Amino acid sequence: MDQREIVEAIATLREYGTETYLIEAKSAKGGFPKCYDTISSFSNKHGGIIIFGLSDSFQVEGVYDVEDLQKKLTELGKNSMSPPVHLDISPVEFEGKTLVAAKVHELPLSEKPCYYTKGGIHRGAYTRVGESDEQMTPYEIYAQQSYKEGVPDDLRPIERASIDDLNGEEIIRYIKKVKSEKPNFAKNDDRKIMRLSGICNDNKPTMAGMMVFGDYPQAYYPQLFIACSSMPGKELGELGGDGQRFNDNQRVEGTIEQMLSGALGFLQRNMKTKVIIDLSGKRTDIPEYPIRALREAVTNALVHRDYSKYTERAYIQVYVYSDRIEIINPGTLYGPNRIDRLGTDTIMEARNPNIIRLLEEKYPAIDGDLMRALENRHTGIPTMRREMAKYGLPEPKFIEGRGLFKVVFYNNSHDSEPDQVSDQVSDQVSDQVSDQVSVILDYCNKPRSLKEIANFLGMTRSYVSRKYIVPLVRNNQLVRTIPEKPKSQLQKYYRNCR
C-alpha cells in the first residue's frame, strides 16, 4: 500500500463526507481505538483500508504513538482474530502529522468468517454494511460455514413427512424416465433410485423431493410460497385512486413448477398489453415486459433461493409497481458468486444442485416454462438483459441485501429526473436512484434520519446511504443537521431550499 492510495482514500472521505464500504477512519489521538469489528468486517467482505489519525470530520489529528499503534495492530490481527489476519500497515506523513493506515485483505472463503476471538463466532463476527460494521446474523454465519463445509440443504429430510406425501404418479414417471436414460439405474429397485436421486433420505422426503414432487409442500413449510402483489403506485403503501392499497394480491403455492406457473400468470394478468394490428388485419399483443426475462427471474428465485432452516420461514415476494417489477428471494448469493460478476462468469456455483438435477431429469427437453428456463442455466442473466434490450427497456437491476437478493425490471414509465438533478449526480446516482430523488427531497422537507428514509423507501440503510444520501449531500441538495459529526447516531437530513 503506497502513500498515493492512502491520500486518495482520505480525499474520498472528505469528498463524500462519510466513510465508505471500503474505507474506515479512526481517531487515535488519545490511544489505541477499538477496531476489531472493522478488521472482521473487511475480512469477511471485500477488504478495505483503516486510516488512524483522522477526526470524525476527517481532519488530520495524528496518532498518539506511531510505533505503539503499529505494534498493537499487528498483535490484534495475529493474536486476537480467528483466523489470524495479516495487516499491511503503513505510517504516512500527511498535512504535517503522522497517520497510520492498515490494509485488510478479504479472506478466502475457506477461512471465513473472521471473528474477534474473545467474542466468539456469534458475537465477534462482523460484516460491512455500507459505511458501518454490523454484527453478522446467525444466518450470515451459517451461509459461510455451510458453503465451506458443503452442506446440501436441499437434501435435508423433512422429518414430519412421509413418502406418501409425494405425488406417486409423477414419481413413477420420473423413475421410468431415468431408468431408460441411465441403464445403470435400471438394476436398482424404486426405493433405492429415489434415495440415490435425492428424492428421499431414510424414507423421509428431502427438501428437493418435496419441492419437485410434493403433493402440497406448504403443509410442512407454510412460508415456502410466492407472495404476489400488484401496487397502484410506485411505492409500498401508496394508495390508488379508489383508496386501494393493492390492485391484486395472490398467494401462490405448490411445487416449484406450480409456483412458477402461478407467478407468471399473475404477472401477465397485472401488466399492460399493447395491441398492434398490421395492414393485413393481424393482431399482435405485446406485453409490457418480456415474458422470457420474467420467467428467468422467477425460476432463479425458486431454484436458487435458500432452503436452509434459517430461511424456511421466508417467502419469495413479487411486486408489480406502476414503473417496475421487483422479485425478491430469501438468501444471499451463494459461495463465491458476486453481484458484479453475475452474467459474466461461465462457472457459477449452485446452492441447490439436487433440485436443479431433479427438475432437469423430470422434464423433457422441450417441456414447459420451467425447462426452458433451466436450459438457460448460466445464461439466464444475459437472457434477461437481452430480452429487456429487445423491448427498449433499461437493463434489470440486481441488488444483494442482508439475507435477500432482488431483481428489478423497469418499464418505459421509468424516466430520469430533470436535467439539473441528473447532471449534478449522474456519476453517483444510477437510473433507479434518480427516479427517487424528488421523493426523497419531498420527504426530507423536515429533518429525517437515515433509518426513517430507508424505512420510507422500503430499502436497506446501507443501500439508501450509498445510492441516495451521499450524492445528494455532496451536491448540497440535502443538508446534515450535525455537519461537524457526519457519523453521529443522531444525524438527520433535510432538504436544502436555498
Predicted regions: what they are:
Residues 1-50, 54-101, 107-110, 288, ...:
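Polybasic/polar functional segments that serve as interface/processing modules
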Residues 84-162, 313-314, 375-400, 405-406, ...:
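Intrinsically disordered, low-complexity regulatory tails
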Residues 124-312, 317-328, 334-336, 340-345, ...:
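Active-site helix-to-loop segments that bind/position phosphate- or nucleotide-bearing substrates
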Residues 289, 459-474, 487:
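Short amphipathic alpha-helical interaction segments
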Residues 434, 480-498:
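Short, cationic-aromatic polyanion-contact patches
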